[in-house]
UniProtKB/Swiss-Prot annotation:
Region feature (3-hexulose-6-phosphate synthase): 162-393
NCBIfam families attached to this UniProt entry: one_C_fae, PRK13307.1
Pathway(s): Carbohydrate biosynthesis; D-ribose 5-phosphate biosynthesis
Keyword Coiled coil: no
Binding site for substrate: D19, L48, K66, T68, Q83
Protein's GO biological process: 'de novo' pyrimidine nucleobase biosynthetic process; carbohydrate biosynthetic process; L-ascorbic acid catabolic process
Protein name: Bifunctional enzyme Fae/Hps
Length: 393
């Protein structure tokens, strides 16, 4: 047996995070159990979980501090409410039948417990660690999460301790606001006016990046820390280097020009994958977008069918979106840019567009928030988890 469980419960400095492994005494878990009790280190001394002095919990459980214990107060918290909570949770799990028909004398548990240096409230420390241990045991035996749950949940919420969300584009359609602004004061004003919405993407436009460099991504993050930010660099050369620069600036996506050599595009896409950001090909002035996508050895995450600002008076030419997606193997988002206005949103969505790129219709509006909300309303998408009550994850 080798089962793994994890749970985080609580809030503030007293929150509890318990990682545990359940396994046979005569296997690798048993060996790790013995090593934990025999190979001690200052500030991380493991301790057997006892319900009270002289009453060992079963299955035998060793509590391992994750954080270095630096003073008497922390030691008292670990040997007091944390240890008692873990021991009681294990004992209650036995009583409630979580271990099934397993002989509790044949297995043992490694429980790694987090204790924040600023924690003070013994009552909360106990209750949070009890709940986290109990939930971690339950999850271990349920082998939680299953693949379906993992895929469904991985992009939905922010990590409770990290404090910010890293957005991913899994629930189209989206509105992408193109910031082709070259004044930082105006930029901050527009950003502050944009509504908070899971379906709103922010684009650092090419003029903005040329004026202020990629450091402008940090300016955007200062106002919109949870935003999905696209760096529209229109890469034409040194694809891997410029894609890495975009990733290092904390952009979520980087744009390359479809007019670049295929090798440059492929290097940029590969580098974007390595750094965990999205790759976007801008098809401005590309005669055969379908042919280009089909010819690439590695496919982008997004294709942008983009008409230049100087050509917006011409008729819509978004191409055959279905053929583009087919050429990419089906797993591709398509953005439409140039001349997008509220009355044509539905038309663009009907063609298969996943992202609508809008610039001056929002950024030059007298009421930026209202203009953005008009477009978002046309998407007819609820906020992700708007009606969900978050509990364990």
């Amino acid at each position: 047996m080798y089962l793994i469980g994890e749970a985080l419960i609580g809030e503030g400095s007293e929150l509890a995070h318990v990682d545990l492994i359940v396994g046979d005494k005569n296997g690798p878990v048993g060996m790790a159990f013995a090593n934990a009790l025999s190979q001690l280190s200052a500030g991380h001394t493991p301790l057997l979980a006892v319900v009270r002095p002289n009453l060992l919990t079963k299955p035998a459980t060793v509590v391992i501090p994750k954080v270095t214990l630096k003073n008497e107060g922390q030691v008292n918290q670990m040997f007091g409410p944390v240890q008692a909570a873990v021991a009681k949770a294990v004992a209650d799990a036995v009583e409630e039948g979580l271990f099934g028909d397993i002989n509790i004398n044949d297995i043992c548990i490694l429980a790694s417990a987090f204790l924040h240096p600023s924690a003070k409230d013994y009552n909360r420390i106990y209750r949070y660690n009890y709940g986290a241990t109990k939930l971690a045991i339950s999850r271990a035996f349920e082998e939680f999460p299953d693949e379906k749950t993992l895929i469904h949940e991985k992009d939905r919420a922010a990590h409770a301790v990290m404090g910010f969300k890293v957005p991913r584009l899994w629930d189209p359609p989206y509105l992408q606001v193109a910031l082709d602004i070259v004044d930082l004061g105006k930029l901050r004003s527009v950003l502050s006016s944009l509504p908070e919405n899971d379906h709103l993407i922010i684009e650092a436009g090419t003029p903005l990046i040329k004026k202020f460099g990629l450091n402008v991504i940090s300016e955007i993050r200062a106002v919109k820390p949870n935003a999905f930010i696209v760096a529209d660099m229109k890469i034409l050369d040194t694809g891997n280097l410029e894609a890495r620069m975009a990733a290092d600036s904390s952009a979520d996506a980087v744009v390359m020009s479809g007019l670049a050599p295929a090798s440059t595009i492929e290097k940029a896409i590969t580098e974007a994958r390595k750094t965990g950001i999205y790759s976007v090909i801008d098809m401005l002035n590309v005669e055969d977008p379908v042919g280009l996508i089909a010819s690439l050895k590695v496919k982008p995450d997004i294709v942008e069918l983009h008409r230049a600002i100087d050509a917006e008076h011409t008729s819509h030419a978004w191409g055959n979106i279905g053929d583009i997606k087919k050429a990419a193997g089906g797993k591709l988002l398509v953005a439409t840019a140039g001349g997008i206005r509220v009355p044509v949103v539905k038309e663009a969505l009907k063609t298969g567009a996943d992202i609508l790129v809008v610039g001056r219709a929002i950024t030059a509006s007298k009421d930026v928030r209202h203009a953005a909300e008009e477009f978002l309303e046309q998407l007819n998408k609820e906020e992700i988890d708007q009606f969900r009550i978050m509990t364990d994850f």
